[in-house]
Amino acid sequence: MIKTARQLKDLIRNLSKDKSADAQILMRNYMMERFLERISLSEYRDKFILKGGMLVAAMVGLDARSTMDIDATVKGATVGIEEVENMIASIISVPVDDGVEFRLKRISEIMDEAEYPGIRVSMETEFDGVITPLKIDISTDDAITPHEVRYSFKLMLEDRSIEIWAYNLETVLAEKLETVVSRATTNTRMRDFYDLHILSQLHGQSIIPADLRAALIATARKRGTEKYLADAPAAFDEVEADPNMEKLWRAYQKKFSYAADLSWHTVMESIRNLYRLARAE
């Protein structure tokens, strides 16, 4: 068990060198893992379903994807500010012998470019005097197709895993694929494009085409964007040919070394192939 900030910082520093990852991001990931462990031990363990960047990073490795926050959906519960406040308070009060203290700072409704509404939770952790900010975005009633899966989340600094509920691979891909199709050149989140590429490269053999197809249709139906699916090939061509999109991709490559050697065309071809797989009869 890690007992001091010095010990933790040394471990993070060594991992940072090994993974060519930012030490500050790894520190935040460690604290996010501490929160996940509390979830896995709490009364909400069967309601809390991990999705988003933290799940993608776990699936592909921290050397191939970084993330700064937790995205989750809650099953079978109302997601209002009061309900989330009670839920988070209960989760962070779960006793875990790791020396980490969680403090709830702010809870607000998500009003930015969210696909559908949710609640944003801002917290901070303290470990041996070191303060780390955390953010959690929580939604409800997501279209998980065919269903969520039990996921063994491998810890960063320990040789063990946490058992949690998570999106299945096909739903992860479907949500991002729907976003790329429906938003086309208005989607400036290059991580969506990267995630589709890296997941297809590393987990392509695990994709069940029928589930991907069903998940894509269910996601589009949930978001009211079914009409865009048939025109996806044209949308992909428009996105790839758009100078601003390629400029955004180059900026993403400069910011994240794991994307440095990926051409824009290669990424878009991966996305086209995923769409073909999803639409195959």
Question: Which residue ranges define each predicted feature?
Answer:
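Structured mid-to-C-terminal alpha-helical surface segments
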Residues: M1-F48, A57-S66, I70-E281
